[in-house]
Amino acid sequence: MKSLLIQTFCLLFLCLGTVRAQQYQLASPNGKLSVTVDAGEALTWQIAHDGTTVLQPSAIALQGRDEKSAKKAITFGKNVKVIRAERKSVESSFPTPLYKKASVKDVYNQLTLKCRGGYSVQFRAYDDGAAYRFISEQNKPFIVLNETADFNFDKDYQAFVPYINDNRNGERYCFSFESYYDEAPLSKMYTDSLSITPLMVCLDGGKKAVIMEAGLENYPGMFLTVNPQTRQGVQAAFAPYPLEEIIG
């Protein structure tokens, strides 16, 4: 699950679609974080806190293909047709054996959009963060080829960026996911370099937005690069699907 964690404040999701887009809203448990989702030709989201824009409309999507047929494309998040919307509130906790606390509270409001094409998109609004994930309802296995995850900001904010600096044998996706942080405006991010997560953006009023992943099963998979058009945001980059697997 992709997450945008905000320190000391809440978030709002807004998905700006196109003509005839369907719109849905979600609020955090304390009411300070509101989420608005527009689903149309594209699926985008926007986040705000207490009158402050945190994230401008940013596209999310997933591209794949049938496991046995390379010509059969599978796309989530394009030309979205929502069949129904489901909502629920959760107040629970989960154990954290390697953390300073024995358990952590898990309190959020959730919106799940069931979409035509065999998938759902799930949004969560926490008091201190927001997240989304795609859920496949395909009856056959498929291969994920790429994912769209944009994070667009309204200004050229200062950011703390953990660049990849250990390209083993020239392979930019082979990395230990450990790095020092460079501090610079978003517009000054290197266009030819990948960043790992978490990446922190310093917003107005002393607020901080942290982009990261959650719910990972094996290893971090999302890298980030500067948006070459706006220079005021970042885009996700993922290691390509391997054509051949060898034991290294």
Residue ranges and their predicted role:
Residues M1-Q23:
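Bacterial Sec-dependent N-terminal signal peptides
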Residues Q25-G248:
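N-terminal accessory beta-strand-rich subdomains and adjacent acidic, glycine-rich linkers
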